[in-house]
Design a protein with these regions (language model features):
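A short, N-terminal "cap"/entry segment at the start of jelly-roll beta-barrel domains
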Residues: 1-33
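Conserved short histidine dyad/triad with adjacent acidic residue
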Residues: 24, 35-52, 86
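Short histidine-centered beta-strand/loop micro-motifs
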Residues: 28, 46-52, 74, 93-95
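Short, conserved beta-strand element in jelly-roll/cupin
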Residues: 40-41, 52-66
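Short acidic-glycine-tyrosine-enriched beta hairpin
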Residues: 70-86
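Ligand-binding loop in jelly-roll beta-barrel domains
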Residues: 86-109
Length: 109
């Protein structure tokens, strides 16, 4: 088992993200295949359109975000989550000019 307290974690910068900082709570080195991050998005924060070979789940803890695919749009509010399959393109923006906090689960195949 791995237990991580609220303020614990390693600070990281995510590629192709802007106006965001975060803490890696659990890494693949600890769990074998899963990384868990807590991301703090500023009011103008988000992520550029990209894809990844890894599965991802975004869970909105605070605020509101929009996750866009090439032909779809998902508005997520507190308590909502989205699953992103390997290879799916997506971008993300923060809504309403207010910060958002997102718990991110990344699973390596």
């Amino acid at each position: 088992m791995i237990s991580v307290k609220d303020a614990q974690g390693t600070q990281y910068e995510a590629a192709k993200h802007f106006e965001v900082y975060g803490l890696q709570k659990i890494t693949e080195a600890q769990s074998q295949r899963t990384t868990v991050c807590y991301s703090y998005f500023q009011p103008n924060g988000g992520a550029e359109m990209s894809s990844s070979p890894k599965e991802r789940v975004y869970y909105v803890v605070k605020g509101s975000i929009t996750v866009n695919g090439p032909e779809e749009k998902h508005v997520l509010n507190e308590g909502d989550l989205i699953y992103i399959a390997p290879g799916e393109e997506r971008d993300m923006v923060v809504n309403n000019g207010k910060p958002a906090e997102v718990l991110v689960f990344i699973v390596t195949p």
